[in-house]
């Protein structure tokens, strides 16, 4: 029996839990910046991006429809450096997530090199049935 991990595919689909469980595995996911997607409960999620070396003004978060985009453009050093080892990335990036229909961004914070984007699922109130009265005379005069 084989087990397949579909989480790399579904990491960028937030709020589609049943779909995430049904799909699992396909393709490579973007490796920079590293990020986590945390589910607190059925209605609260948090995306955390590790952005060492970035400043708050280097970052932009945009929500367009159900597409959440995060972009980072770090200030480039004035002079070229010679690295003996470079393990920290300080490069521009663009990352996007597709949110479920009723997901909204409730806030974002940038603390100690971690960008936290909080999401909430707002389930719409079901529309109550409306009773229509039937009159004795026709609605249209013919």
UniProtKB/Swiss-Prot annotation:
Q: How does it assemble?
A: Homodimer. Forms homomultimers of about 100-150 subunits at optimal growth temperatures. Conformation changes to oligomers at high temperatures or high ionic concentrations. The decrease in size of the multimers is accompanied by an increase in chaperone activity.
Function, as annotated, reads: Associates with aggregated proteins, together with IbpA, to stabilize and protect them from irreversible denaturation and extensive proteolysis during heat shock and oxidative stress. Aggregated proteins bound to the IbpAB complex are more efficiently refolded and reactivated by the ATP-dependent chaperone systems ClpB and DnaK/DnaJ/GrpE. Its activity is ATP-independent.
Name the gene behind this protein: ibpB
Which family, according to UniProt? Belongs to the small heat shock protein (HSP20) family.
Query: What's the protein here called?
Result: Small heat shock protein IbpB
Q: Which HAMAP family does the record associate with it? A: HSP20_IbpB
Which InterPro entries does this one have?
A: A-crystallin/Hsp20_dom, ACD_IbpA/B, HSP20-like_chaperone, HSP20_IbpB
* UniProt cross-references to CDD domains, sorted A to Z: ACD_IbpA-B_like
């Amino acid at each position: 029996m084989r087990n397949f991990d579909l989480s790399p595919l579904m990491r960028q689909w937030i709020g589609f839990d049943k779909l995430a469980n049904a799909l699992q595995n396909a393709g490579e996911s973007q490796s920079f910046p590293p990020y986590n997607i945390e589910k607190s409960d059925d209605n609260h999620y948090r995306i955390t991006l590790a952005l060492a070396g970035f400043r708050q003004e280097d970052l932009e978060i945009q929500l367009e429809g159900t597409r959440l985009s995060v972009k980072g453009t770090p200030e480039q050093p004035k002079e070229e450096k010679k690295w003996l080892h470079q393990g920290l990335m300080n490069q521009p990036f663009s990352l996007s997530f597709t949110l479920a229909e009723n997901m909204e961004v409730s806030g974002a914070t940038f603390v100690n090199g971690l960008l936290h984007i909080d999401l909430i699922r707002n389930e719409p109130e079901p529309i109550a049935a409306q009773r229509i009265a039937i009159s004795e005379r026709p609605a249209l005069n013919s």
